Regions:
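Cyclophilin-like peptidyl-prolyl cis-trans isomerases
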Residues: 1-190
Length: 190
């Protein structure tokens, strides 16, 4: 993983949690094929098989850091912060611990035009997919409908094949993998 300096609040928060061992033993508790893999729920460390997860977190939120103009968006392999929905979190503040890694899909122009209309409605026209974004979503894939909605703060730099394997595992009705997929140990590499 590489963390972006352009998102210092999220970067520093994530590094602090890694250094204290907060991610050691947590599950990827929500996996949706052709969309993303989500982890970081501290309750997942000791979760029973089939237990509903996704509510665990620390007692603080991280302010949003959207950096679309700097080329930081939801392309395949992006690391982003999960958050509660707009109905209870209109400020789009990020979860302190929960994160997801984007898989998504490849789009054509027609599909991206539909995404742009959806973004126009949800953001009041403040998020416009750039030419670079459109090209990336047409070649690499990703989740463009999340741009300007969730903070992207890093990317997978090696092991995208592992992300692909995880996003393909069988899941239950709550998108939890039928067999646990666990982060054994997270550590900082300089």
């Amino acid at each position: 993983m590489e963390l972006y300096n352009e998102t210092p609040l999220h970067r520093d928060n994530f590094l602090s949690l890694v250094r204290e061992g907060a991610y050691d033993g947590v599950l990827f508790h929500r996996v949706i094929q052709d969309f993303m893999i989500q982890g970081g729920d501290p309750d997942s460390v000791s979760a029973s098989p089939g237990q509903m997860l996704g509510e665990g977190d620390r007692d603080y939120k991280v302010p949003p850091e959207f950096r679309l103009e700097e080329g930081i968006y939801h392309r395949r392999g992006s690391l982003a912060a999960a958050r509660e929905g707009d109905d209870v979190n209109p400020g789009k503040e990020s979860s302190a611990m929960q994160f997801y890694i984007v898989w998504g899909r490849v789009f054509d122009d027609e599909g991206l035009d539909r995404v742009q209309k959806r973004l126009d409605m949800s953001t009041g026209g403040t998020v416009v997919l750039s030419g670079e974004q459109r090209h990336s979503y047409k070649t690499e894939g990703g989740t463009p409908h999340l741009d300007g909605q969730y903070t992207v703060f890093g990317k997978v730099t090696g092991g995208l094949d592992v992300v692909d394997s995880i996003q393909r595992v069988p899941t239950d009705a709550n998108d939890r993998p039928l067999e646990d997929v666990r982060i054994i140990k997270a550590y900082v590499v300089k």
